[in-house]
From Swiss-Prot:
Requisite cofactors: Fe cation
Protein known as: NADPH-dependent 3-demethoxyubiquinone 3-hydroxylase, mitochondrial
Protein family according to the UniProt entry: Belongs to the COQ7 family.
Role noted for this protein: Catalyzes the hydroxylation of the 5-methoxy-2-methyl-3-(all-trans-polyprenyl)benzoquinone at the C6 position and participates in the biosynthesis of ubiquinone. Catalyzes the reaction through a substrate-mediated reduction pathway, whereby NADH shuttles electrons to 5-methoxy-2-methyl-3-(all-trans-decaprenyl)benzoquinone, which then transfers the electrons to the two Fe(3+) centers.
Chief place of localization: mitochondrion
Membrane topology, as annotated: Peripheral membrane protein
List of residues binding Fe cation 2: 90, 142, 178, 181
Keyword Repeat: yes
Keyword terms: Iron, Membrane, Metal-binding, Mitochondrion, Mitochondrion inner membrane, Monooxygenase, NAD, Oxidoreductase, Repeat, Ubiquinone biosynthesis
Start-end of each Sequence repeat: 48-129, 130-217
Originating gene: Coq7
Family matches, as PANTHER family: 5-DEMETHOXYUBIQUINONE HYDROXYLASE, MITOCHONDRIAL, COENZYME Q10 BIOSYNTHESIS PROTEIN 7
Subcellular location: Mitochondrion inner membrane
Length: 217
């Protein structure tokens, strides 16, 4: 059994026995542990947690597809290693949300096939504008995701910061890494992209629509 499979199996085992199992975002792997306190399927706001995990999984999947599109166009250029580094972090984000989907029995959004195509097209399309276009896309998307994560952090803290402590740690860590990507984009001339302000607004409008739809479907 793979490491991810073992983690998922252990998590589901904890859930089936009713033993609370918080999860940790420290290091590169998601560690799901059985404890006497924390989140269980019985004591959480299932609707809220399902929505959070579903939309965040969709967002990280879309981000992976965007970076895949950018690498398809710019992978052999001088900015390729920069994009690859950000993509590697997004792969780790997606891996953790895949594990959470299993642990909390959350179904993915039905719109995954759309985000597959749309994400790659957005990444490749903006990369065709050059390095600046790709970085403008990164700035727009990562700013939207960070704002979205901040909203989730506020909601969970208002509901029960102690109960959701480790979920909050996951989201905060990912939020901080998305902001690093945002800053990387600015450092690599995002604002020099053609029609930068308009491009950013259009991409962020698309992000808002994707978040809205993925939360609900």
């Amino acid at each position: 059994m793979s490491g991810a499979g073992a983690i998922a199996a252990a998590s589901v085992g904890c859930l089936r026995t009713g033993v609370p199992r918080p999860f940790s975002a420290y290091g590169r792997g998601l560690i799901i542990r059985c404890h006497s306190t924390g989140m269980t399927l019985d004591n959480i706001n299932r609707a809220a947690v399902d929505q959070i995990i579903r939309v965040d999984h969709a967002g990280e999947y879309g981000a992976n597809r965007i970076y895949a599109g950018q690498m398809a166009v710019l992978g052999r250029t001088s900015v390729g290693p920069v994009i690859q580094k950000m993509w590697d972090q997004e792969k780790n984000h997606l891996k953790k949300f895949n594990e959470l989907m299993v642990a909390f029995r959350v179904r993915p959004t039905v719109l995954m096939p759309l985000w597959n195509v749309a994400g790659f097209a957005l990444g490749a399309g903006t990369a065709l504008l050059g390095k600046e276009g790709a970085m403008a896309c990164t700035v727009a998307v990562e700013e939207s995701i960070a704002h979205h994560y901040n909203n989730q952090i506020r909601m969970l803290m208002e509901e029960d910061a102690e109960k959701y402590e480790e979920l909050l740690q996951v989201i905060k860590q990912f939020r901080d890494e998305e902001l690093e990507h945002h800053d990387t984009g600015l450092e690599h001339d995002a604002e020099l992209a053609p029609a930068y302000t308009l491009l950013k607004r259009l991409i962020q409008a698309g992000c808002s629509a994707a978040i809205y739809l993925s939360e609900r479907f």
